[in-house]
Amino acid sequence: MGDVVIRKILLGYDGSEDAEKAAALAASLAQKYGAAIIVCHAFGHMPVTTKPSEVRRLVNPVVERFTKLGIATQVAIPDEIPAQGILSAAEEYQADLIVVGGRGRGTFANLLLGSTAERVLRFAKVPVLVVR
């Protein structure tokens, strides 16, 4: 097998505990491989009153952490349900790896694997790392 090449990591981020763990691992991988991180928070599942500016407030702390670590960072805020938004953003930004938390902020937090992570695993065209 050849060398692993990771230039862009797409992080699915919702502010949950598992998403924070995923963010830490994404940062570590980005530093190791010199990769950029695209922080993705799809908000199509949120109430109509939710605005992209509110989503930015959610993702800004993690973006600032990455920036302080010297990691090139972009933000993607697709207006799609989470799994589809992550998959669309991964394709749009040509991500080499998707990193997501195993369980998000959904109402079924006791499930073995969250529905978003499961759908991303099933349909992604690039490797997916699920963090718990």
Feature names for model-found ranges:
Residues 89-132:
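Gly/Ser-rich helix-loop-strand patches that form or flank binding pockets
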Residues 13, 77, 102:
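Conserved residues at beta->alpha junctions
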Residues 1-4, 57, 67-98:
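Structural beta-alpha unit
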Residues 39, 82, 125-127:
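Proline-centered helix-kink/hinge sites
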Residues 40-42, 76-80, 131:
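Conserved beta-strand termini and adjacent loop/short-helix elements that scaffold enzyme active sites
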Residues 2-53, 58, 65, 71-74:
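Small/aliphatic-rich secondary-structure junction motif
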